[in-house]
Swiss-Prot record:
Organism this protein belongs to: Natrialba magadii (strain ATCC 43099 / DSM 3394 / CCM 3739 / CIP 104546 / IAM 13178 / JCM 8861 / NBRC 102185 / NCIMB 2190 / MS3) (Natronobacterium magadii)
Compartment(s): Archaeal flagellum
Primary localization class, coarse: other
Gene from which the chain derives: flaB1
Family matches, as PANTHER family: FLAGELLIN B1
Cleaved propeptide residues: 1-11
GO CC terms in record: archaeal-type flagellum
A Gene Ontology biological process term: archaeal or bacterial-type flagellum-dependent cell motility
Any one Gene Ontology molecular-function term assigned to this protein's record: structural molecule activity
UniProt function note: Flagellin is the subunit protein which polymerizes to form the filaments of archaeal flagella.
Upper classification of the organism: Archaea, Methanobacteriati, Methanobacteriota, Stenosarchaea group, Halobacteria
Protein name: Flagellin B1
Alphabetical keyword list: Archaeal flagellum
Amino acid sequence: MFEQNDDRDRGQVGIGTLIVFIAMVLVAAIAAGVLINTAGMLQTQAEATGEESTDQVSDRLDIVSVSGDVDDPDDPTQINNISMVTATAPGSDPVDLNQTTAQFIGEGGEEMFNLSHEGVFINSIQGVSDEPDNNVLTESSDRAEVVFELDGAPGSYDIGYEALDESERLTVILTTDAGASTEQEIRVPSTFIEDEESVRL
């Protein structure tokens, strides 16, 4: 009436259980390995993103002063170039001005260009190489003058942006290679004073 299990049947059941157990252990080990690998990748990605975000905040320029030259000191009507004295922001890594972009936004439209543009001139004031291909602000004490030649300025080259009239406003955004931006609002005086070659903006 009743089936009798002999030692052979019990042995087969034991082997089957062992195989299932080993399979479960292998699956768990593989899953753990995948989780560890994924966690490592996410941590690396998070660190890289964090460093990039830090660079975008800290590796930026400070604008120390802004001035402009008038078209004719005897009868001034327009600003035909803009001069910015630049430095690195506190805590910033070195900034290569040749890899920095400028964006002009105002009544004359919008223009974006690199500071290596032929209508931009970079002059060393302190701590910056005079070589055109090595305009790097390294120390916080370094200073460089960036001159933007506007349309109508004397000479062969300009950045393609119109000269500024009295009372005109202009927004200039400088963005470093790290992606950090500095915005400067420029306001041209409502009246020019005769015999002044430049004005503070």
